[in-house]
Every structure is written in C-alpha cells, then in structure tokens.
Design a protein with these regions (language model features):
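Conserved, well-structured core segments that form the ligand-binding/active-site neighborhood
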Residues: 121-271
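C-terminal structural cap/anchor segments
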Residues: 278, 282-326
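Short beta-strand segments
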Residues: 5, 42-44, 76-77, 103-108, ...
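Short acidic, glycine/serine/threonine-rich loops at helix termini
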Residues: 15-17, 85-88, 113-121, 182-187, ...
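N-terminal glycine-rich anion-binding loops that anchor highly charged ligand groups
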Residues: 25-43
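Cap/lid and interdomain-hinge subdomains that line or gate substrate/regulatory clefts
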Residues: 1-3, 25-29, 63-74, 78-190, ...
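Glycine-rich, highly charged phosphate/nucleotide-binding loops
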Residues: 51-65, 306
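Conserved, well-ordered active-site substructure
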Residues: 320, 331-377
Length: 385
C-alpha cells in the first residue's frame, strides 16, 4: 500500500483525483487505517490550520501508525507555495521515521509555479507579488525559499537536480519545468522522506511505470439538493461568487456581523431560514463570505467555524445529495461538524477538484477544491448552470 500524508483536506482530495487518473483505488481518512484495502491511503492531518505545537502532536500520532503499516511508498503532500508548518513537520517526521534525508519539491510547473535561483515564482513573477500575499492565515511576504520555510542557517539546501546531492539533510528542489520533476523523481531512495505538490506525486507514479487511464471527457452529473460553501477569502473566490450570482445561481451571504466572534443566535437563525428557503425553491444554494467581511486571521477562523455550523444546520434540516466546498480548512471543519471521517474519490472534475463518496451515506457526495484553484467551466458543471 502507498500512503500520502496531506496537511490540508483539499490537498488530500487533489491526490485522490490523481489516484483516479492513474487507476488507483484511494481512501481519504483522518487516521492511519491499518485495515484499509485501498491502493493509496491518503491521510488528512489538517495540520496547516493548527498551531505548530498541535501540528507536531498530530504528526507524532500518524508516524506511530505508519511504523506498523509499513507502506511501500510514503509521500508528504504539502502546499505548493509552502504555507503551513512545512519544515517543522518534515524535520519531526525525519526524526520519528529515522530518515536522514528529505527532499521537498513544492513546484507545480503546470500551474506556473516554479523555483529558480532559490526564489519561488508564480507565472514568472515573485510569489509575494501575487494574491498569496493576502492569505489571511499564511500571508506570503517573501519569495525566497528559506524565508517561506522559516529556515535557519543549515536547515536546508536549495539545489538543482544536477548538483551533487548531500548524504544527509533537507534539499529543496529547483524546478523550472516537468523535465526537472522527472529528473528529481530518479533521486528517491529508501532513506529519503519525500514531500511535494501534486504534480511531483504524479511524476513519481509515472516513474513507477504507472500511466494515466484513457477516459472520455464527460460532464459531472451532480444531483440536487446541493449546497456550495465558498469560504475562501481569495479574490478569485469572491469574483466567482459574484459571477454565479449574476448568472442566477442562488447565493446566501453570511451576515457580516457573524464574521466576528458573535454569538447572535437570532441573526444566525434568520440567515439559515433564508438559506433553506432558497435551497427548497431552487434545489441548490451557495453560502458565501459577505463582501464587507474582513479576511484577517481572526476573522478567517470565525468564518470557518460559522460555515461549518451552517453546513451542519442545513444538513440537519434538508437531505443533501451534494456538498461542494472550497478551501481545505473550511472543508475539514465541515467534515468534523458532520461527523465524516472517510471519503472515497469517484470523479476528478478538474485539476484539484475531486468528487467523493462519503462512507456510510450512499446519498451524499462531497466535492472539494483548494481556494486558489478554479472551479470547472460551467459547460462541464451542469449544477452551476
């Protein structure tokens, strides 16, 4: 069995979509399932949304289970722009699993995300000049790899694949194109912890002689009633909500006051009543961040929790067949609130956008995507029309 440890639920779902592409049966869970029958076990730790201390505690627990499972391949799925506690988690995993070497390959060249001369570039421009600088939880203030990882002197080396590789320590890969990914995939060995973004994981699968399945492109058949949760503060997300509302998709905005640490149960109740009415009338509804809401770290946590409460309330009042969520921390909060701890990918709708079956509920499917990714085009996504 192969195992991927993801620090975020949408990252786990993205790997699940790749598993489908390569004909692998995948299971997404929050713990090490020693009895899993899957080809690929994907463990969502949700550590990106935790404090570093809490994240390390989760990693310790996961590594204990991994020692018993003994996977044939272990890959740590990280955020491609290195948000979260990436270095601290990798250093701890090295210690616990007794792996002297680690390789971090964050680049996704297919999405314009590259590492050149120790600098992270997005479509050729320094990362900190992009919308990632406005991330409420992990704002990007620098494009330097060492600064992004908060690395101290001697913690890491940033190297191209053709440079001599050290016998111990952590290497961050310079990558300009897919050929560089292929070259890095040939440097793996049993003493090396491998971490990276989705594109590198796909490259590793191909290095293992796996090939993408040839499938016909088809529209996603999604069944109402459907709830879409737009909890990401990214400008693309806000623009998307505005566009679908203009196109006639029912949108229920969270009252701005609920973005604060408000305990106004009456206001929450009124919002839910209005949302349920839209769902009943239209068969679908999106709950979204109010345009006037702040998107700093404190508000992000409140918004995430409110979105999860709203999802649980709506699911308790209506039978939902589809829940579509953007943003990994929001998705994880919703899953916890709904008591969901195991998912099985069934359809990759677009890069990073994966539809999954919920264990124990044949009627319900979850579709997840990272906040910085795009939803599929409307003509491939009939629910959005």
């Amino acid at each position: 069995m192969m195992v991927v440890i993801a620090d975020d639920l949408t990252g786990a779902a993205e790997i699940g979509g790749l598993a489908l592409k390569y004909g692998l049966m995948a299971e997404i869970t929050t713990t090490v399932n020693l009895h899993s029958k899957a080809d690929l076990l994907i463990i969502d730790t949700d550590t990106r949304s935790l404090s570093q201390t809490a994240a390390k505690a989760v990693i310790r627990e996961i590594c204990t289970g991994l020692k018993e499972l003994q996977p044939t391949l272990l890959f740590k799925k990280i955020d491609s722009v290195l948000r979260g506690h990436v270095l601290a988690e990798i250093q701890l995993q090295q210690e616990l699993l007794q792996l002297p070497k680690a390789l971090i390959v964050p680049a996704n060249p297919g999405l314009g995300r590259t590492v050149v001369n120790s600098t992270y570039l997005l479509n050729g421009q320094p990362l900190h000049q992009s919308s990632f600088s406005q991330d409420p939880e992990f704002p990007v203030y620098s494009s330097g790899i060492r600064e992004l990882l908060q690395a101290k002197d001697g913690d890491i080396q940033v190297l191209p694949h053709y440079a001599p590789q050290p016998g111990a320590g952590i290497v961050v890969a310079e990558v300009q194109n897919s050929s560089d990914l292929v070259a890095w995939s040939k440097t793996l060995d049993a003493d090396k912890l491998v971490a990276g973004a989705a594109e590198f994981f796909a490259t590793i699968l191909e290095a293992m002689n796996m090939r993408p399945l040839v499938t016909k492109e088809s529209s996603a058949i999604l069944h109402p009633p459907a709830l879409m949760i737009c909890g990401s503060a990214f400008h693309k997300s806000r623009a998307f909500v505005k566009k679908i509302e203009q196109d006639g998709f029912p949108v229920s905005y969270m009252p701005a006051a609920l973005g604060d640490a408000s305990t106004d149960t009456q206001l929450f109740q009124l919002w839910m009543e209005a949302t349920l009415l839209q769902l009943k009338q239209e068969g679908k509804v999106s709950i979204a961040i109010h345009p006037q809401m702040e998107d700093d770290k404190a508000h992000a946590l409140n918004i995430r929790n409110r979105m999860a409460e709203a999802a649980a309330f709506i699911a308790g009042q209506a039978t939902l067949h589809e829940i579509l969520i953007e943003g990994g921390s929001t998705a994880a909060a919703v899953m916890r609130k709904l008591g969901i701890d195991r998912l099985y990918p069934t359809m990759a709708l677009a890069p990073g956008v994966t539809r999954m079956r919920v264990q124990g509920n044949k009627e319900l499917h979850l579709t997840l995507k990272p906040g910085s990714y795009e939803w599929p085009p409307l003509d491939l996504f009939p629910l959005m029309q």
